[in-house]
Amino acid sequence: MRFTKMHGIGNDYVYVDCFRQQVEDPSALAKAVSDRHFGIGGDGLILILPSQAADVRMRMFNADGSEGQMCGNGVRCLAKYAYDHGLARTNPIRVETAAGIRVIDLQLDGSGRVAATTVDMGEPILEAERIPVNYPQKRVIDMPLRAGQRAFGMTCVSMGNPHAVIYVDHVAAVALEQVGPEIEANPLFPQRINVHFVQVLSPSEVTMRTWERGSGVTLACGTGASAVCVAGVLTGKTGRSITAHLPGGDLKLQWRESNNHVYMTGPAVEVFSGDWPD
């Protein structure tokens, strides 16, 4: 099986071009290839498929084999692959995902290849029952939550997948590998949840760390950064346009009032290609 390793600011996935080959058991394959010691290494597996509704279709699987709805950095890299490898030569590219169609604007380098992308991440979902969160109020804004023997304030947003945003004074001091899985598996979240700890540097700048549902600690999370942009406005901590510093690099986010959509801009990198034994 031919594969390509790609990353968006360190959020890395193994990509399989299913225009040219088929994958029989993507869940098992995701677990095998994602292993950083015995596999290729990555946060999961992304299949690039034909689509009847858009230019291409994306299916993503987390490192534990569970299927996810959407990955912001993953869809940006998929758009780069599709354009650079001739699967779709339109700009913008429309990608069908389990969370809906995403439109990606491409920024090309001097050789005509994709260097960076801007994704229309769509409208955030703010209603608790649709995120979903087991919470009696309509929205989950600064809700008290205990984890790791600490009390936090949590704001929840869905960008096609559920996110919990928690603001702290010093993000580096958070015991992420302890409290991340505890919050992810909290009964409040029937589908589990992605967890983000955020430190506000200014109204237009934050730094954040992520525990991804099904993958653990990751260097970046595009849907998570989008949720952080929305949560900042809901809590009054940031404006509608921010730069998010993640361990793997920076993303620029904007939640536009004009159409209620979130836009995310960042680089997309093809690392290497190879053959995985069948």
Residue spans for each PLM region:
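Glycine-rich beta-alpha junction loops
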Residues: 123-125, 159-163, 268
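Selected transmembrane alpha-helices and immediately adjacent juxtamembrane segments
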Residues: 154, 162-165
